[in-house]
């Protein structure tokens, strides 16, 4: 079941939430819409669902004009961040609700509904909670029940709006793996919205990075992480060191000094050098492109994070690097830093 969005524009007063957005979701794909608040990701999801209407543009589902139909006619399963379970209904009745309110001509028999709900509760591994009420469930259990309810009507597509946003970090991580494995079983064309970069990279087949109502990049998790298409994507996904540089005559300058780094075909002028924290090799003073002094060191897990004062930037500017614990960095150490991978983007 393919989804295609072409030239979608949506404005709220003077604010343009979506600016000529084009997107195609392939049959059976699990796609993430990733971006900060206000990037347009939830608005795009709601337009696909039929909960919002664009000012202009085209939305098709399996080749049909979706904008000619309301939300109910699009046969979409929708999962909200805050579950939206009916508190007065037990788990079984919540999952069965969508089946029981279908038009009579397509409604299943009570025996079929019972079997369908039982199968779904087994699928989400919560059959033993069929008689419980929402207030008797954990947050993770409620979200799985909400997903089972969305799947009950056998939707053509499944849309999830920040599905794990209300859960604590440990439960979120568990449910990411669970959702990815579940999708491998059901193969329903699915789109989920998130602002969590790790979540998008871990769960999705493809990631759509959005900012200010536009799509910055579409690609596999590996593509958007390893080959970011813009300064925004590099800065938003992962943790980066960002340095103000200038490209001049094919060389990269930081302050008054030429760096021994290629300009990567960047245009001449003010630019920004992006380096991921873990892509910097730490060595003795004089061994790298940059020189600095260790200002502070903090341990976390197998790594240590150090605040470094670079010679080129002055004492008021710190950068952070990640290094293995066995480097035994100490406050006051003079060190050399060598970027292993980096990107240069024009400073707009």
Swiss-Prot record:
Indicate the principal place this protein occupies in or around the cell. membrane
Recall the GO molecular function terms of this protein's record: ABC-type sulfate transporter activity; ABC-type thiosulfate transporter activity; ATP binding; ATP hydrolysis activity
Keyword Cell membrane assigned to the entry: answer is: yes
* Claim: DNA damage is one of the keywords in the record: no
Q: What's the top EC group for this one?
A: translocase
Q: How does it sit in the membrane?
A: Peripheral membrane protein
Q: Where is this protein found?
A: Cell inner membrane
* Enzyme Commission code(s) on record: 7.3.2.3
Top-rank taxon of the source lineage equals Bacteria
- Which residues does the record give as ATP binding sites? 35-42
Q: Which InterPro entries match?
A: AAA+_ATPase, ABC_SmlMolc_Importer, ABC_transporter-like_ATP-bd, ABC_transporter-like_CS, Mo/tungstate-bd_C_term_dom, P-loop_NTPase, Sulph_transpt1, TOBE-like
The family database entries (NCBIfam families) matched by this protein are listed as:
3a0106s01 (TIGR00968)
Give the family from UniProt.
Answer: Belongs to the ABC transporter superfamily. Sulfate/tungstate importer (TC 3.A.1.6) family.
Q: What is this protein called?
A: Sulfate/thiosulfate import ATP-binding protein CysA
């Amino acid at each position: 079941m393919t989804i295609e969005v072409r030239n979608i524009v949506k404005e709220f007063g003077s604010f343009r939430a979506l600016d000529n957005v084009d997107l195609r979701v392939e049959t059976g794909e699990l796609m993430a819409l990733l971006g900060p608040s206000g990037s347009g990701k939830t608005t795009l999801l709601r337009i696909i669902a039929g909960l919002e209407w664009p000012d202009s543009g085209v939305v098709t589902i399996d080749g049909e004009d979706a904008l000619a139909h309301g939300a109910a006619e699009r046969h979409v399963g929708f999962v909200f961040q805050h579950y939206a379970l009916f508190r007065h209904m037990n788990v079984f009745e919540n999952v069965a609700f969508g089946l029981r309110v279908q038009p009579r001509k397509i409604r299943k028999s009570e025996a079929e509904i019972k079997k369908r709900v039982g199968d779904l509760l087994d699928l989400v591994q919560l059959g033993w909670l069929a008689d419980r009420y929402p207030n008797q469930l954990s947050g993770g259990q409620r979200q799985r029940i909400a997903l089972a309810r969305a799947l009950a009507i056998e939707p053509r597509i499944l849309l999830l709006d920040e599905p794990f946003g209300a859960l604590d970090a440990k439960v979120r991580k568990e449910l990411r793996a669970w959702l990815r494995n579940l999708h491998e079983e059901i193969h329903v064309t699915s789109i989920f919205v998130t602002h969590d970069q790790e979540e998008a990279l871990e769960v999705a087949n493809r990631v759509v990075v959005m900012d200010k109502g536009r799509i910055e990049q579409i690609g596999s998790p590996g593509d958007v992480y390893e080959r970011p298409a813009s300064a925004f994507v590099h800065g938003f996904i992962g943790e980066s060191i960002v340095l103000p540089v200038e490209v001049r005559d094919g060389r990269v300058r930081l302050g008054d000094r030429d760096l021994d780094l290629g300009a990567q075909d960047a245009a001449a002028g003010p630019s920004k050098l992006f380096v991921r924290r873990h892509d910097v090799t730490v060595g003795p003073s004089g061994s790298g492109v940059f020189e600095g002094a260790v200002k502070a060191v903090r341990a976390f897990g197998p790594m240590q994070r150090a605040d470094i004062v670079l010679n080129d930037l002055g004492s008021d500017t710190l950068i952070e690097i990640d290094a293995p614990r066995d480097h035994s960095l100490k406050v006051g150490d003079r060190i050399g830093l060598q970027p292993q991978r980096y990107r240069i983007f024009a400073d707009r």
